[in-house]
């Protein structure tokens, strides 16, 4: 069923058509009705079109916008340690806090929540092959190297592969990668927490508010106009 607002809009449109038909005569009435109907539909299209555009653009790589780059560690809920990308292209969740191989650079792929993750020390991207195994690649342009960040109700983050929907980045209690085909969003193995590397300070933390001292103001009346004048010191 349509909303009351839509029904009211249609009723008003019909009334307007009838009024114009009465003024313009029988020959002009139907044409006016068609023109008004097209205008009415055009006024309702932009919202749906914009929503469709957002959905379509969130599924493809954004080549126009400036990419947001973040640096942090991924703390594994099951292993109790951090995800690392080693020089031998192995990926596990066995790194201690502050380990240089646990420092990850996360690049946004779209204006949505899709990202590419690479090791800051090795420059290798975390990807997933057709068997659901996590692999490291020097070229992360493929869709298999794109993950969708999903913030869960427990405040943990899950990373779902963009190419293999329903397959997640996951690690066992021993920090070994788990095949994406055996993962589900509710499993602890796919839950991660973002943490800043040890000793890393964000720009926001280094900023301090600066307050400017202005003399106090009092209100005075000059004739019929109100002005502001500083208090005498």
UniProtKB/Swiss-Prot annotation:
Coiled coil: none annotated. It comes from the Eukaryota. Glycans are attached at residue 155. It is found in: Secreted. One of its GO terms (molecular function) is growth factor activity. GO terms for biological process: anatomical structure morphogenesis; aorta morphogenesis; blood vessel remodeling; bone development; branching involved in blood vessel morphogenesis; branching involved in salivary gland morphogenesis; branching involved in ureteric bud morphogenesis; cell fate commitment. Its main location: secreted. Monomer. Homodimer. Interacts with FGFR1, FGFR2, FGFR3 and FGFR4. Affinity between fibroblast growth factors (FGFs) and their receptors is increased by heparan sulfate glycosaminoglycans that function as coreceptors. PANTHER family: FIBROBLAST GROWTH FACTOR. Belongs to the heparin-binding growth factors family. This is Fibroblast growth factor 8. It comes from Homo sapiens. The lineage of its organism: Eukaryota, Metazoa, Chordata, Craniata, Vertebrata. The gene is FGF8.
